[in-house]
Amino acid sequence: MKLRHFGRTGWKVSEIGYGMWGMGGWSGSDDAESSGSLECAVEMGCDFFDTAWAYGEGHSERLLGELVRAHPEKRLYVATKIPPKNGKWPARSEYRLDETFPPDHIRRYAESSLKNLGLERIDLLQFHVWDDSWAEDERWQRAVDDLKREGLVLAFGLSLNRWEPENGMRALHTGLIDAIQVIYNIFDQAPEDELFPLCRQLEVAVIARVPFDEGSLTGKLRLDSRWPEGDWRNHYFGPENLKASVARAEALHPLIPQGMTMAEMALRFILSNPDASTIIPGMRKLRHVETNLGASDHGPLDAELLERLRAHRWDREPAPWSD
């Protein structure tokens, strides 16, 4: 597993991390299976784990805390997120800071996450949603600065709305944001336009999330794909999105090199960009951990393939089905 610099923090983290959304105790998740997959990831050199209070109201955080405490000999980086007070995703400009991240709410959830994790500090605490209309509000800035000065949180970050990579750039200029989490993949290349250059300039780490576009870039999405009742993908891949996603993914099949899967190609597309500090594919099953983390061994894609993949950029606007 190769390591990358994580912005200005001084950390060097695994270039493929672990997204723990699927370990929130949802339907289909199994704690024993999840713990086994996490252990495998550590053995393979993964040291960056991204969770959130909202993933099962602390359930995923507790699993991560158990993992970290079981490996005192290793430096495992813990990233978690504060939910918005109003419980609404995504953030919208009409929501005031008092409705989303007032100072007392920031501290309360920082302390709640510390309790769930069973740790003395959080490496990276992130706002789970963000709108840049709040960027200049000094109240969240003071709350973040206080948590850092007290040593409860080492670094702070933002998780950006889907398909709004510029909606966070004003906050970066405060100097308080150390990392940005953004959707970036073969289809979603827009962060390269303005966000990534600013992150380079300010030495802000980039966490690339949704590397498989919720599943279309695994190569397994079909027009008749269905998921268990309650699975969010039934909403995301509804009539407005499924047909287009399948067509876009099928257009990539001729580009997949022999001996490579579409999922590996998707991960290595991101690895080919040095602006990405780490990628956090969601993983629950052992076989996915092994194949996804193994992509680090193969390195970037060749320049010709990268150029051809760039033609598959797909700029989209947020919609009710994408929330």
Model regions and ranges:
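A short, structured active-site edge motif that brings together acidic residues
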Residues: 74-87
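N-terminal binding-site loop/beta-alpha segment at the start of enzyme catalytic domains
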Residues: 1-76
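Residues at the N-termini of beta-strands
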Residues: 15, 48, 121-124, 154-155, ...
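Surface-exposed, active-site-proximal loop segments in enzymatic domains
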Residues: 86-100
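Short, acidic/polar
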Residues: 29-41, 100-117, 162-171
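Short loop/turn motifs at secondary-structure junctions
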Residues: 12, 42-45, 72, 118-121, ...
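Beta/alpha (TIM)-barrel catalytic core signal, keyed to glycine-rich beta->alpha loops juxtaposed to Asp/Glu
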Residues: 33, 129-323
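Active-site groove signature of glycoside hydrolases
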Residues: 114-133
